[in-house]
Amino acid sequence: TEYVTLKNLEVLDKWVSLSSNKYKGTVKRSVWLSEAGTCSPSYRYNDLQDQAAGFAYGWKKINNLDGIDGIQWHSWFDHLGDGVPLGLRKYSDEEYKGEAKPVWTTYQKAGTDEEDDYFEQYLERIGIKSWEGLIQDIP
């Protein structure tokens, strides 16, 4: 794809590591994925699980790429005007009341001692056997 996505973050990691893209050729520039996230097209179980699995996948990649410093999630709550529900929680309206989505708990476990055990549930959904080998080599 011509766009940087969670699936091809290695391309951005490679780009930022090139001396031609470093400050004065030697200092790595900070790269933060901001206003980023995965969405749940609906509040159906599978869509919510896909969103959480997508976050887990991205988190594991980001933390294994030296060129990417972190991710700033797009929004805590889904917003009707956004066009896609990227929030960690559902709409904060009378119907949904900002209820936590599965991605909320996944986000909470990220970077803690519970991360590996909790994230394991998403391996099959993503279609991989382990997090090993998640990072692709970019020539």
Identify what each model region corresponds to.
Residues 1-45:
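Noncatalytic carbohydrate-binding groove/subsite architecture in carbohydrate-active enzymes
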